[in-house]
Amino acid sequence: SDTAFAIDGKGFFAVRGADGNTYYTRNGNLKFTLAANGGNMLATSDGLPVLDTQGRPIVLGSNYVMSNVTVSKDGSLCYPDAKNNPQPIGITIGVFQFNNGLERLADSLYQQTAASGQAINEARNNNVEKSSIIQGYLESSNVQVVDEMVNMIVAQRAYELNSKAITASDEMLQQANNLRR
C-alpha cells in the first residue's frame, strides 16, 4: 500500500501514545485515519499518531487525495498542493545509542529508558547515521519458524544417526581387539 513504510537503518518511527508520551516503533504498516479536526492523520495500525520532525501528529487537510502521498528516502512525506507541487512534511525518525535498552511495551511499541539513552531525532542531528524510508514495503521477520523447526529436527536426527554409527563402530573395534587376545 501507499502507506507501507520500511526503515532501512537503525531508526524508529516516533508516535504519540494515548497518554501523550512519545513512543517508538519500526512497524511501518501505517494508514490515514480521520483526525479530530476533520483532517487525515497518519497513524499506526493501532491508531497512534505518527509524529513530524517538530513532534506534532502528521495531519493533512481532508481535501488531499491520500493515494497521491509519497515518501522520500530521507523521511519526508510529500503530498501535492492545489498546484500539484510536492509539499514535504518530515517524519520523525529517532535513533538510540543502545537499542537493547528500550523497554518493549507491546508487539512493536517501545519506550526509551535510561539504558537506551535519549532518542536522537535524525532530522535535527547531522552526527548520526541516517536511516532511509522505503515506501511500499514492510519490515518483517526473515525467519520462517516452521521451516527452521523442521530443519532443526532433521539436523537432530542426523546427529543421532551419526552418534549411533560411531557407537557401533567403537563396539566393533572393541570386539575385534577382544578376538586378538
Provide a role label for each language-model segment:
Residues 1-181:
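Amphipathic alpha-helical polymerization modules
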